[in-house]
UniProtKB/Swiss-Prot annotation:
Residues 70-77 are annotated as: Complementarity-determining-2. The lineage of its organism: Eukaryota, Metazoa, Chordata, Craniata, Vertebrata. GO terms for cellular component: extracellular region; immunoglobulin complex; plasma membrane. This is Probable non-functional immunoglobulin heavy variable 3-16. Residues 20-44 are annotated as: Framework-1. PROSITE patterns: IG_LIKE (PS50835). Residues 116-117 are annotated as: Complementarity-determining-3. It comes from Homo sapiens. It holds the Pfam family V-set. Residues 53-69 are annotated as: Framework-2.
Length: 117
């Protein structure tokens, strides 16, 4: 019975607490093949500096594809093969921001890009 009462108490406390994770992307636009574009993502509602972060994309008629990831402190980065040496992921923990620099864009890079925790 004590366990059940603990849950009721916890639910009562959390009912008034509102915590919303927000990831807001910006910087998109149409760019000719060969051009460059920098995407930004402003994060809030969680401890950004403790979280590994990623970019994913959804091209028309295709599934969601992971593009790139960066460790919590920026020391490790990873890329899908198709964007290696063209895209650069980076972060600024002091600004709670994630970035994706897209260089030498190709037609197949046209997609909706998402910032992913």
């Amino acid at each position: 019975m004590e366990f059940g009462l603990s849950w009721v108490f916890l639910a009562g406390i959390l009912k008034g607490v509102q915590c919303e994770v927000q990831l807001v992307e910006s910087g998109g636009g149409l760019v000719q093949p060969g051009g460059s574009l920098r995407l930004s993502c402003a994060a809030s509602g969680f401890t950004f500096s403790n979280s590994d972060m990623n970019w994913a994309r959804k091209a028309p008629g295709k599934g969601l594809e992971w593009v790139s990831g960066v460790s919590w402190n920026g020391s490790r980065t990873h890329y899908v093969d198709s964007v290696k040496r063209r895209f650069i992921i980076s972060r600024d923990n002091s600004r709670n921001s994630l970035y994706l620099q897209k260089n030498r864009r190709r037609a197949e890079d046209m997609a909706v890009y998402y910032c992913v925790r």
